[in-house]
């Protein structure tokens, strides 16, 4: 029993040794390296932005055309070598209905119209009663319908002399007149101009030329424009083929209603855009893939008369007839190819059915407008400065029966067999502005023939009722919201801001300066990554984008920088034309915004201690909650920088605050370290070059003490005098000679009697000064000697303490070494015993197996003998 207990005790001791060894090894094996936040500059990361865009155009500086004048003052010249960089493997969301570029273009075109068609006079409306009769004409046909809508009105106006009136005549459209309920009127022919009391009229004179030229919208420095190149893209949703440009393509700011003129064509299929194309009262924007030529003509000439109304005047068409004058100067017409137009409507219907996923046969009707203001119920556009109003009833008079996704079985339209279609138009002076909703009177039509060639590139439609998948559906032309036209031109653009940096976790950290251990670590190289430019590696993973800067990088960066530099040089070259107008201020804001963004980003990097570094390691420990479901390997191998930046967008401000706090602490540590470094220059105090400075300080101290002593003496004298004492005069010491011996003296003093002696210095100022100096010198000497003695004793104590500390440290190290040696020996013994036990067990098992095999073998070997013995027994 005693032997068994000893064996168990020995086994328990070995087990405890094994447990301790495992406890020491498990933390080492389970250790995972800490991740730290690292700032990367120049990574392909962006976010949507709304900066102030500026325009570029190829304006003719010598032209007097109003659009050229406006473009030369508001826009910079275009870049002769524009660059477009495709982004591989990059997808991004676009939304034309929330694109601020549309709003900015809308404001710009308003500014263009305000400047190009700027009125020269401002006057109140002709609020007078007029007697109007139908305009007599012998013409018949389509154009006569427009003439029949006009009235010949006569009215009285006030001349410069207020007490004198004069009768005038002018032509007005019926839609611009309101009948007056006057009992004295004959046959109810008294009229007045509509809204004459509520509208301020701006009259444009003289007539100006107005021909739109293409305008390019450009992003300022630090921003870029994404362009979607998907063929089936409709302005909303995810785009898979994206490229980066600095400026858009040339956009012609043509203003029109119902039809889109001179716009951007769809590349393959007809493009249909809308917030909800199956609802009624929602605009459906159609962009054709083939242009349809339309030519508008106004024939004839006319004279213009001035009608004075007091100190002002109003210009109108005269009724004087001559060989070359005609009241038909306000009548025009437009021609187009009916076959091409009919095919465009049919393809629009088929494309619409594909978008709404229609499976059954339906009937689609294109009908005339439902009415409204003349600008909405007609095709309204500007041609050579004249305002055209065209009736499009003939263009939208088609019915497509039994239509499917592939085609329509029957088409019902106009019965005319003529290949070219014609729509009547009229020119008007009284125009309701699409910009501010106010009415304006412009000068009468200019004389001569007017011809405008335009391309129909789209149309704006509305459903009468919500989409009916089993019955008829009617589409009508609408207009009025010019933003729909700008959307067809800007649907595939969006502006983004290039982020200067991003944050990601790495295993490298910034060396922390500790005031107790001021040793600086050498920064590790890490990934050694330099990026291929701002957006050239946008589609690559974070790890793949981290490659060395190559020649391709220089070319990409050089291209982007050169393009921005070209634009800025163009702005600088045109500064004399960019006046301090709205556009001049906008150009200045665009440049200042880019500069402010750059300064703000550089300031943030400076505060983080990352100035001039592409990769900036920090001492901020990465929180695993920031990464979410991603680990370190999946971040660098599976995500792009854009995806990663969107993932940490909600916590980026927290990370930035942590980096800022860590940098502040780092600066405090540096300050404390520098203060500690000052003690290292203690031995410089004994430098011979500083002795003169020490002597000067000593002289100043002694002089100050003497001065204080003199002041105290003077104050003491003043005090004594006030108390009634008289100060003694200064006495000069004189030698004292021995007096002659008097009779009766025995000369008991002895010695040399004839030697002179000095008596003690009588009390006075010099004696007091000498005493003070002697006292100060002795005090200084004793003070310095005591200080040196104290320092020596302190050094002795420090040395003794350091020696004792060293002895203790050595003893502790020896003890630790002995303990470690003991535990290592125990581990070695435990391992040896374990191996011995395993060997003995294996040997026992091996011996048992061998013995069993031997017995089995012997059994097989004894089989013949047993058979022989059995046979012998049987035979016996």
Swiss-Prot record:
Q: Where is this region: V3?
A: 296-333
Q: Would you identify the family this protein belongs to, as annotated?
A: Belongs to the HIV-1 env protein family.
Q: One Gene Ontology cellular component annotation?
A: viral envelope
**In its UniProt entry, what is this protein called?**
Envelope glycoprotein gp160
Q: Where is this region: Immunosuppression?
A: 586-604
Kindly list any coiled-coil regions of this protein. 646-680
Which region ranges are annotated with the description V1? Answer: 132-152
Annotated region Fusion peptide: the residues are: 524-544
What are the recorded Gene Ontology BP terms?
A: clathrin-dependent endocytosis of virus by host cell; fusion of virus membrane with host endosome membrane; fusion of virus membrane with host plasma membrane; positive regulation of plasma membrane raft polarization; positive regulation of receptor clustering; viral protein processing; virion attachment to host cell
UniProt keyword terms in alphabetical order: AIDS, Apoptosis, Clathrin-mediated endocytosis of virus by host, Cleavage on pair of basic residues, Coiled coil, Disulfide bond, Fusion of virus membrane with host endosomal membrane, Fusion of virus membrane with host membrane, Glycoprotein, Host cell membrane, Host endosome, Host membrane, Host-virus interaction, Lipoprotein, Membrane, Palmitate, Signal, Transmembrane, Transmembrane helix, Viral attachment to host cell, Viral envelope protein, Viral immunoevasion, Viral penetration into host cytoplasm, Virion, Virus endocytosis by host, Virus entry into host cell
Spell out the post-translational modification annotation for this entry.
Answer: Highly glycosylated by host. The high number of glycan on the protein is reffered to as 'glycan shield' because it contributes to hide protein sequence from adaptive immune system.
Query: Which Pfam family, giving just one, matches this sequence?
Result: GP120
Entry domain remark? Some of the most genetically diverse regions of the viral genome are present in Env. They are called variable regions 1 through 5 (V1 through V5). Coreceptor usage of gp120 is determined mainly by the primary structure of the third variable region (V3) in the outer domain of gp120. The sequence of V3 determines which coreceptor, CCR5 and/or CXCR4 (corresponding to R5/macrophage, X4/T cell and R5X4/T cell and macrophage tropism), is used to trigger the fusion potential of the Env complex, and hence which cells the virus can infect. Binding to CCR5 involves a region adjacent in addition to V3. The membrane proximal external region (MPER) present in gp41 is a tryptophan-rich region recognized by the antibodies 2F5, Z13, and 4E10. MPER seems to play a role in fusion.
Q: Where is this region: CD4-binding loop?
A: 369-379
Q: Region labeled V2 — which residues?
A: 153-196
Ranges per topology, Cytoplasmic: 719-876
Q: Where is this region: V5?
A: 468-478, 470-478
What one GO molecular function would you report for this record? Answer: structural molecule activity
Q: Where is this motif: YXXL motif?
A: 725-728
């Amino acid at each position: 029993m005693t032997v068994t207990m000893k064996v168990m005790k020995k086994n328990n001791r070995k087990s405890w040794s094994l447990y301790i060894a495992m406890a020491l090894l498990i933390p080492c094996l389970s250790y995972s390296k800490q991740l730290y936040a690292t700032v990367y500059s120049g990574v392909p990361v962006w976010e949507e932005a709304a900066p102030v865009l500026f325009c570029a155009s190829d304006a003719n500086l010598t032209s007097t055309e109003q659009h050229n004048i406006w473009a030369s003052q508001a826009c910079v010249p275009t870049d002769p070598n524009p660059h477009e960089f495709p982004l591989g493997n990059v997808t991004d969301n676009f939304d034309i209905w929330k694109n601020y570029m549309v709003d900015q273009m809308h404001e710009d075109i308003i500014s263009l119209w305000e400047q190009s068609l700027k009125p020269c006079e401002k006057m109140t409306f002709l609020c007078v009663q007029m007697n109007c009769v139908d305009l007599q004409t012998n013409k018949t046909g389509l154009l006569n319908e427009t003439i029949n809508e006009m009235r010949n009105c006569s009215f009285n106006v006030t001349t410069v002399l207020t007490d004198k009136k004069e009768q005038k005549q002018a032509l007005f459209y019926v839609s611009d007149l309101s009948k007056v309920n006057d009992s004295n009127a004959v046959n109810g022919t008294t009229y007045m101009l509509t809204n004459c009391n509520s509208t301020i009229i701006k009259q444009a004179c003289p007539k100006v030329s107005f021909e739109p030229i293409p305008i390019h919208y450009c992003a300022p420095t630090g921003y870029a424009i994404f362009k979607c190149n998907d063929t089936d893209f409709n302005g909303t949703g995810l785009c898979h083929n994206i490229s980066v440009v600095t400026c858009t393509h040339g956009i012609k700011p043509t203003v029109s209603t119902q039809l889109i003129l001179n716009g951007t064509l769809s590349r393959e299929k007809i493009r249909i855009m809308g917030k909800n194309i199956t609802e009624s009262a929602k605009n459906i924007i159609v962009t054709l893939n083939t242009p349809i030529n339309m030519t508008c003509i106004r024939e004839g000439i006319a004279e213009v008369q001035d009608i004075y109304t007091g100190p002002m005047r109003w210009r109108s068409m005269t009724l004087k007839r001559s060989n070359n004058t005609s009241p038909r100067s306000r009548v025009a017409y437009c021609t187009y190819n009916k076959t091409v137009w009919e095919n465009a409507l049919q393809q629009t219907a088929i494309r619409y059915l594909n978008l709404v996923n229609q499976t059954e046969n339906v009937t689609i009707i294109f009908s005339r407008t439902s009415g409204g203001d003349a600008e909405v119920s007609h095709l309204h556009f500007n041609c050579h400065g004249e305002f055209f109003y065209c009736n499009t009833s003939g263009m939208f008079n088609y019915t497509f029966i039994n239509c499917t996704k592939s085609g329509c079985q029957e088409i019902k339209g106009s019965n005319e067999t003529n290949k070219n279609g014609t729509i009547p138009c009229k020119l008007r002076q009284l125009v309701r502005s699409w910009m501010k909703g106010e009415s304006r009177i412009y000068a009468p039509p200019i004389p001569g023939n007017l011809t405008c060639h335009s391309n129909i590139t789209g149309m704006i439609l509305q459903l009468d009722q919500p989409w009916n998948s089993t019955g008829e559906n009617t589409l009508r032309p609408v207009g009025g919201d010019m933003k729909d036209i700008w959307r067809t031109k800007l649907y595939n653009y969006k502006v983004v801001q290039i982020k200067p940096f991003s944050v990601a976790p790495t295993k490298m950290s910034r060396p922390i300066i500790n005031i107790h251990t001021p040793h600086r670590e050498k920064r590790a190289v890490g990934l050694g990554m330099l990026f291929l430019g701002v957006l050239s590696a946008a589609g690559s993973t974070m790890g793949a984008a981290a490659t060395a800067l190559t020649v391709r990088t220089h070319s990409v960066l050089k291209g982007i920088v050169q393009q921005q530099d070209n634009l800025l040089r163009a702005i600088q070259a045109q500064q004399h034309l960019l006046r301090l107008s709205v556009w001049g201020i906008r150009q200045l804001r665009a440049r200042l915004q880019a500069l402010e963004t750059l300064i703000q980003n550089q300031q943030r990097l400076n505060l983080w201690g990352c100035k001039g570094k592409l990769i900036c390691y920090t001492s901020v420990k990465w929180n695993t909650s920031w990464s979410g479901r991603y680990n370190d390997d999946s971040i660098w191998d599976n995500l792009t920088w854009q995806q990663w930046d969107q993932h940490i967008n909600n916590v980026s401000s927290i990370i930035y605050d942590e980096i800022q706090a860590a940098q502040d602490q780092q600066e405090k540590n540096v300050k404390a370290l520098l203060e500690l470094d000052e003690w290292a220059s203690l031995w410089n105090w004994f430098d011979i070059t500083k002795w003169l400075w020490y002597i000067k300080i000593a002289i100043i101290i002694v002089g100050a003490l003497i001065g204080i002593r003199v002041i105290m003496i003077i104050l003491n004298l003043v005090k004594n005098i006030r108390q009634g004492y008289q100060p003694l005069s200064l006495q000069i010491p004189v030698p004292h000679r021995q007096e002659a011996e008097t009779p009766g003296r025995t000369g008991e003093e002895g010695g040399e009697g004839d030697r002179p002696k000095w008596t003690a210095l009588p009390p006075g100022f010099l004696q007091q000064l000498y005493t003070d100096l002697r006292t100060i010198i002795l005090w200084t000497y004793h003070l310095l000697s005591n200080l040196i003695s104290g320092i020596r004793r302190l050094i002795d104590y420090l040395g003794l303490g350091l020696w004792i500390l060293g002895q203790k440290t050595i003893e502790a190290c020896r003890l630790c070494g002995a303990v470690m040696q003991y535990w290592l020996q125990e581990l070695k013994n435990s391992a040896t015993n374990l191996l011995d036990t395993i060997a003995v067990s294996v040997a026992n098992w091996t011996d048992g197996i061998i013995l069993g095999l031997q017995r089995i073998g012997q059994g097989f070997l004894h089989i013949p003998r047993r058979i022989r013995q059995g046979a012998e027994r049987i035979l016996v």
